[in-house]
């Protein structure tokens, strides 16, 4: 019976520590500076502008897109050649043993 109060106390301590970590987290400015240092971007240097989804949609709808031209495949690739699968005349009563990879006549 002593294990259930012990488990309850342990669960409460875990809950309190999790709430403490969440509520006492680092301020936003400290986190941003740490992230900039990790990306090797000097503090104070301008980061490229980030656009929202509606702004991007507006920009794309107002710009006329040029059609993409498909480039020809490089000539270094081997071109596929269809094999001539015409029916060859076989002698009568020839048996094809496909599991043996041969034909017996």
Curated annotation (Swiss-Prot):
Beyond the main fields, what else does the record say?
A: Biological activity of somatostatin-22 on rat pituitary cells was found to be only 0.01-0.1% of somatostatin-14 activity.
Provide this UniProt record's keywords sorted from A to Z.
Answer: Cleavage on pair of basic residues, Disulfide bond, Glycoprotein, Hormone, Secreted, Signal
According to its UniProt entry, this protein's organism is: Ictalurus punctatus
Taxonomy of origin reads:
Eukaryota, Metazoa, Chordata, Craniata, Vertebrata
Molecular function GO labels: hormone activity
Task: Please state which protein family the record places this protein in.
Answer: Belongs to the somatostatin family.
* Gene, per the UniProt record: sst2
- Disulfide cysteine pairs (residue numbers): 94-105
Note the pro-peptide positions: 25-81
* Domain of life from the UniProt record: Eukaryota
Per the UniProt entry, the glycosylated residues are 88
Q: Where in the cell is it found?
A: Secreted
Known function = Somatostatin inhibits the release of somatotropin.
* UniProt keyword Disulfide bond present: yes
Give the range the annotation lists for the signal sequence. 1-24
Full protein name: Somatostatin-2
- Which tissues show it? Pancreas.
The record's listing under Pfam families reads:
Somatostatin
What's a GO cellular component annotated to this UniProt protein? Answer: extracellular region
> What does the UniProt record tell us about how this protein is modified after translation?
O-linked glycan consists of Gal-GalNAc disaccharide which is modified with sialic acid residues (microheterogeneity).
């Amino acid at each position: 019976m002593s294990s259930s109060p012990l488990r309850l106390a342990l669960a409460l301590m875990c809950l309190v520590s999790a709430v403490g970590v969440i509520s006492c987290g680092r301020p936003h400015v400290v986190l941003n500076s740490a992230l900039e240092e990790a990306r090797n971007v000097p503090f104070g240097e301008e980061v490229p502008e980030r656009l929202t989804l509606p702004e991007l949609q507006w920009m794309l709808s107002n710009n006329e897109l040029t059609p993409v031209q498909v480039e020809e495949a490089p000539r270094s690739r081997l071109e596929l050649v269809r094999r001539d699968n015409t029916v060859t005349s076989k002698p009568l009563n020839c048996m094809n043993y496909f599991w043996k990879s041969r034909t017996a006549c």
